[in-house]
C-alpha cells in the first residue's frame, strides 16, 4: 500500500469527480469499475480470482484504518465529554457554594500558584514604579505614557474585573471562558430536584435563553458573538444548577460579556494563563504566549515585545548614523 504522504496526491481530481456524481459513493465506485472494465484488462488479464482477491485485500486494509480512526475519534470525544462534565461539575459546585453565603475556601494548588503570581506581579510593578520615580521624573516619554494609561483607564472605568475563570460572577449566574469555549452556571433556589422537563434551555447561534418553565428567564439575550450550536451542550448538576457549555466560532477573542444585557468585564485584565495552552494549535499558542508576555511587561511598566522591536530598530539606525543628533527627536 502507498505511504500516507502519497494518499492525498489525487484528492483534488477525485473530489472533482465525486462532485459530478449526484448518486454519491455508489455511483462513483461504479464509474471507477466501469473504467477498469472498459480501458484495462483488470478483470480478465490475470489468473482467475486475482481481481476479486485484490479488491478484497484493499477493502479490508482501508476498512481497518477507518475503524481504527473511528475508535480513536470516539475515545477523544469520550475524553472531551468527561473533561467537560468534570469542568461543569466544578463550576456548578462553585456556583452552589457562592449562593450558600460566605465561607472559608481552601485554595487548590493551581489557585494558590495563580494567587502567588498575582502577588509577585504586584510587587514587581511597585518596585518598577519606585525606580521610575527615582530615575526619570518629568521626562516627556513618561508623561505621555501616563496620559495614555489614564485615557485607557477612563475607557475601562465601570467595567468589572474578571473572575479567576476570565468571566464574571453576576447576581444570578456565573460564567467563565477560554479563547475557544465558555461555561455558564445558573443556580436555582427551588425546593425540589430539577429535571429536564422543568427547565428551558435554548441555545442558538447568537442567542441564549435559560430559565424555569412558566417563569421569566434568568438568561435571555443576544450573545456577545456566535457559537457552534451543534457542539454546545447543557446539563443539570446536583438537581439545582443548570450548566451550559458553549463552543465559540471565533477562537481568537475574549468575550467582554455573555449576553448584551450583562455588564462588561475589563478584558485587559484577563489572565490568559487560566486557559489551557496545551489545547491550542501552535499558531494560536504562540500568539497567546505573546499576549501573556506583553501583559506582564505592561503590568511592570516595561515595553511590550512590539515596542522592544521598535527600540532595537531605532538603536541600530542611531548606531549607523552617529553624525545625526537625536537628542530633540520624539518618537511614537
UniProtKB/Swiss-Prot annotation:
Name under which the protein is recorded: Nuclear migration protein nudC
Family: Belongs to the nudC family.
Keywords: Acetylation, Cell cycle, Cell division, Coiled coil, Cytoplasm, Cytoskeleton, Microtubule, Mitosis, Nucleus, Phosphoprotein
SUPFAM superfamilies to which the protein is assigned, alphabetical: HSP20-like chaperones
Record flagged with keyword Lipoprotein: no
GO biological process: cell division; mitotic metaphase chromosome alignment; mitotic spindle organization; protein folding
Modified residues (N6-acetyllysine): 240
General function of this protein: Plays a role in neurogenesis and neuronal migration. Necessary for correct formation of mitotic spindles and chromosome separation during mitosis. Necessary for cytokinesis and cell proliferation.
Region Interaction with EML4: start-end pairs: 174-332
Span of domain CS: 168-259
Amino acid at each position: 500500500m502507498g505511504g500516507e504522504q502519497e494518499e492525498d496526491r489525487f484528492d483534488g481530481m477525485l473530489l472533482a469527480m465525486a462532485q459530478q456524481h449526484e448518486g454519491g459513493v455508489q455511483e462513483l465506485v461504479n464509474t471507477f469499475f466501469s473504467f477498469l472494465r472498459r480501458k484495462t484488462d483488470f478483470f480478465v488479464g490475470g489468473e482467475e480470482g486475482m481481481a476479486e482477491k485484490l479488491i478484497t485485500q484493499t477493502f479490508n486494509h482501508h476498512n481497518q484504518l477507518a475503524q481504527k480512526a473511528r475508535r480513536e475519534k470516539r475515545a477523544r470525544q469520550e475524553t472531551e465529554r468527561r473533561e467537560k462534565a468534570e469542568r461543569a461539575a466544578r463550576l456548578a459546585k462553585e456556583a452552589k457554594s457562592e449562593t450558600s453565603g460566605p465561607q472559608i475556601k481552601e485554595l487548590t494548588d493551581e489557585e494558590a500558584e495563580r494567587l502567588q503570581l498575582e502577588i509577585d506581579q504586584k510587587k514587581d510593578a511597585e518596585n518598577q514604579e519606585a525606580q521610575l520615580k527615582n530615575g526619570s521624573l518629568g521626562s516627556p516619554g513618561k508623561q505621555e505614557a501616563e496620559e495614555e494609561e489614564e485615557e485607557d483607564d477612563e475607557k475601562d472605568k465601570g467595567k468589572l474585573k474578571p473572575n479567576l475563570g476570565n468571566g464574571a460572577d453576576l447576581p444570578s449566574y456565573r460564567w467563565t471562558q477560554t479563547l475557544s469555549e465558555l461555561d455558564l452556571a445558573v443556580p436555582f433556589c427551588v425546593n425540589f430536584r430539577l429535571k429536564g422537563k422543568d427547565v428551558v434551555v435554548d441555545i442558538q447561534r447568537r442567542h441564549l435563553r435559560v430559565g424555569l418553565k412558566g417563569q421569566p428567564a434568568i438568561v435571555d439575550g443576544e450573545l456577545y458573538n456566535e457559537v457552534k450550536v451543534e457542539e454546545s451542550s447543557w446539563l443539570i448538576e446536583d438537581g439545582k444548577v443548570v450548566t451550559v457549555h458553549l463552543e465559540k466560532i471565533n477562537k481568537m477573542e475574549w468575550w467582554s460579556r455573555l449576553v448584551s444585557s450583562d455588564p462588561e468585564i475589563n478584558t485587559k485584565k484577563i489572565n490568559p494563563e487560566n486557559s489551557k495552552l496545551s489545547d491550542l494549535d501552535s499558531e494560536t499558542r504562540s500568539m497567546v504566549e505573546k499576549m501573556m508576555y506583553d501583559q506582564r511587561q505592561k503590568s511592570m511598566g516595561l515595553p511590550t515585545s512590539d515596542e522592544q522591536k521598535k527600540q532595537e530598530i531605532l538603536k541600530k539606525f542611531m548606531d549607523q548614523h552617529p553624525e545625526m543628533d537625536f537628542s530633540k527627536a520624539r518618537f511614537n
